[in-house]
Amino acid sequence: MSGDLWFLDASAFLKLLLNEPESAELERWRVGRRLASSDLLRTEARRGVAHMEASVLRSCDELLAGIQKVRLTPALLDRAGRIPGRGLRTLDAIYVTSALQLRDDLADFVSYDRRQLAAAERLG
């Protein structure tokens, strides 16, 4: 990975949105960086804050608007389903496969899920 896009999964995105232990450090880190994610983030992030105040929902939409998204296509979903091995959950496989679509443009993959990070590293 040698580009300038930083790929976020939902665990990292929600830490940017909510007040969690890693949030302040992650917020400082993201300043000036170009962010990307899967189209899946649109649903997963909104589901993660659906029970919260309207202001949090608005902040979620504003933050989502500034992130480049990889479209979910049948081919991408098929590739995600074919990742070898056990232990990688379905949504995590979709994030990893989405990141692989941007491989040449990526600086790194940001997640707080160890299994997902291991799969992303293993697959390149």
Please provide the spans of the model-predicted regions:
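Short active-site oxyanion
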Residues: 2-4, 32-35, 65-68, 103-108
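A generic structural signal for short hydrophobic patches within well-formed alpha-helices
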Residues: 13-14, 42, 116-117
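A general structural signal for well-ordered alpha-helical segments in protein cores
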Residues: 23, 42, 57-60, 77, ...
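Anionic, Ser/Thr-rich low-complexity intrinsically disordered regions
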Residues: 35, 51, 58-62, 66-69, ...
